[in-house]
């Protein structure tokens, strides 16, 4: 069911309207409102239910509200990262948000610029570990201003790979504490039986669950 009971800035609303994405579905509005109330949120709804809007909308809000704010998106594959960068840039068209992918394909000469200027960094768990956390001193400004961390396709982080990613996230949270930030988390997953367990295993924080598909 579409729902209008949510405030987003007028420019963003116009953009969403022009792309046929407004009004939002109930599960999108629920996730965004829970996030605004200060919660960490896991959205576990079927494919093609518009989960990515649950994090693109708050990210755009956050990054237009204060230009120094930073956000981090984690995807398991480069193809997904590329898809969502294009979706984000299309949704944020004309809002002057600096977004960039930072992965193994990022040219060395671009890396310092991205580190310094990108408000939204899109990466994968391995690059987060090897390229960002291990060089955390040169990312200190990013960590200080980091407000939101998005983990999409979270259901793939199971078993050995899941344990590895959970360790990377723990390290990320520790560095955020050291640099004085306390980012919120949004996780998105396919429909799974126990989203609370997944979020606890992976992040180690309490999460609000959104799993009623309102599309």
Residue spans of the language-model regions?
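Conserved P-loop/Walker A NTP-binding site and adjacent catalytic elements of P-loop NTPases
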Residues: 13-179, 183-188, 197-203, 207-215
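Interdomain "pre-motor" coupling segment immediately N-terminal to P-loop NTPase/helicase cores
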Residues: 1-7
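Canonical AAA+ ATPase core
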Residues: 193-195
């Amino acid at each position: 069911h579409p729902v209008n009971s949510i405030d987003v800035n007028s420019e963003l609303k116009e953009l969403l309207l022009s792309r046929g994405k407004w009004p939002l579905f109930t599960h999108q509005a629920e996730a965004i409102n829970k996030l605004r109330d200060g919660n960490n949120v896991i959205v576990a709804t079927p494919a093609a239910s518009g989960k990515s809007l649950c994090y693109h909308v708050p990210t755009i809000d956050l990054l237009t509200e204060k230009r120094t704010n930073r956000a981090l998106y984690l995807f398991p594959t480069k193809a997904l990262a590329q898809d969502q960068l294009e979706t984000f840039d299309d949704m944020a068209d004309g809002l002057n948000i600096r977004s960039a992918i930072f992965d193994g394909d990022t040219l060395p000469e671009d890396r310092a610029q991205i580190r310094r200027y990108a408000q939204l960094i899109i990466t994968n768990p391995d690059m987060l570990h090897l390229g960002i956390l291990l060089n955390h001193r040169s990312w200190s400004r990013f960590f200080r201003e980091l407000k939101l961390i998005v983990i999409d396709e979270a259901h793939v982080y199971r078993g050995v790979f899941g344990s590895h990613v959970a360790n990377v996230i723990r390290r990320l949270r520790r560095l955020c504490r050291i640099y004085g930030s306390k980012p919120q988390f949004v996780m998105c997953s396919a429909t799974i039986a126990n989203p609370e367990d997944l979020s606890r295993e992976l992040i180690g924080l309490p999460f609000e669950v959104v799993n009623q598909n309102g599309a």
